[in-house]
């Protein structure tokens, strides 16, 4: 009986903590929403906007500059996605950095299927749904 109680307590704790056992880390995937878009569509959009992989903790993503991150953010907003986390935009939060993407007249890149298919993620994992043409 004690073992069952411990097991149920552990499951409840993991559920409350929001852990997803066996699943990939979500990070940016969970931060974006758009009507009709599932996790796969969010992943595709992130890759098409220039994110190396759809998972924040991947080493390729850690190498990005603040301007690169702000550019991906701007691309996602331009495509109709909403940042669920909030807390201000990259341009607001890094105003003192004078990011190129935040300057008047800066060109915000559009989503690119070519960029997604040539991303480090899709080159390494072509079997993933995000990497289907």
Residue ranges and their predicted role:
Residues 15-18:
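C-terminal motif of bacterial Sec signal peptides marking the signal peptidase cleavage site
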